[in-house]
Curated annotation (Swiss-Prot):
It comes from the Bacteria. PANTHER family: UPF0235 PROTEIN C15ORF40 (PTHR13420:SF7). One of its GO terms (cellular component) is cytoplasm. SMART domains: DUF167 (SM01152). It comes from Rhodopseudomonas palustris (strain HaA2). Pfam families: DUF167. Gene3D superfamilies: YggU-like. This is UPF0235 protein RPB_0109. Belongs to the UPF0235 family.
Amino acid sequence: MAEAWRYSAQGVAVAVRVTPRGDRDEIDGLETLSDGRPVVKLRVRAIADGGEANRAVIELLAKALGVPKRNVRLLSGATSRQKQIAIDGDPKSLGETLRQLTAAKPAG
């Protein structure tokens, strides 16, 4: 499966699919969308109202990747379950951490 993130000089851009109102905040592996694009599956407890789920996604990714929240920003998908998230930092290190976090769960 292809990676759900792209590398840049500043860090990585990650394609995610978010499930709000989950039973916990977690990275839930990789998934291939119907159009063939890979995404990282995320669950957050927050509801999708007033940006709460978006804030929860940023907090979850920052904590999981060990970067400050200010290094994680929403690129697109503010009102959609599918989002593009930019994470600033060392691209190689971020990519390896994402690989480890998503490899723990099989693709669905």
